């Protein structure tokens, strides 16, 4: 009896787990995020472009205009964004250069060399800076669409 109940529970659990990918696809799940096979993209194949906010961007996975995504972003050395927010929170990982991501009015920058990361809460004003003299490249990932909302 106990064995039969255990088998039934395992069968139900397996059916639920097997259904999750289909539900994600039906809900508009991201095919790159849950691809059927692995994907390899050398840095030489990244296609950088200027987005509508003027950022130099290459798409990682997903669609930054509509939902979950990752992007590579380039900033020239010694430059800073204006004070701005994003609707959705994100994580940033520094690939090249030295970045600082600070709240407005911060008294000093907290240098983030290559390999460092930061978390930016959605709706919180901040300034992103490339504080090295050389170009900065960082990888950003978010569960929501990308936007850049200048502070007023």
Annotate the PLM regions.
Residues 2-12:
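Bacterial N-terminal signal peptides that target proteins for export
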Residues 69-86, 121-123:
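Conserved short histidine dyad/triad with adjacent acidic residue
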Residues 106-123:
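Short acidic-glycine-tyrosine-enriched beta hairpin
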Residues 76-78, 86-105:
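Glycine- and acidic-residue-biased ligand/ion/polar-headgroup-sensing regions
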Residues 11-22:
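Bacterial N-terminal signal peptides
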Residues 25-69, 152:
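A short, N-terminal "cap"/entry segment at the start of jelly-roll beta-barrel domains
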Residues 81-83, 101-102, 120, 125-131:
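Short beta-strand His + acidic residue motifs that chelate non-heme Fe in jelly-roll/DSBH
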Residues 122-146:
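Ligand-binding loop in jelly-roll beta-barrel domains
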């Amino acid at each position: 009896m106990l064995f039969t109940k255990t088998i039934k529970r395992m069968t139900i659990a397996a059916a639920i787990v097997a259904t999750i990918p289909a539900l994600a696809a039906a809900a508009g799940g991201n095919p790159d995020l849950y691809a059927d096979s692995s994907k390899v993209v050398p840095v030489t194949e990244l296609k950088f472009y200027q987005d509508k906010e003027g950022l130099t961007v290459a798409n990682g996975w997903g669609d930054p205009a509509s939902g979950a995504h990752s992007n590579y972003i380039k900033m020239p050395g010694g430059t800073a964004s204006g004070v701005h927010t994003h609707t959705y929170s994100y994580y940033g990982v520094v690939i090249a250069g030295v970045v600082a991501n600070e709240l407005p009015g911060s008294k000093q920058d907290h240098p983030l060399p290559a390999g460092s990361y930061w978390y930016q809460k959605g709706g919180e004003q901040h300034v992103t800076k490339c504080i090295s003299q050389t170009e900065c490249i960082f990888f950003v990932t978010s569960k929501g669409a990308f936007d850049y909302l200048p502070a007023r």
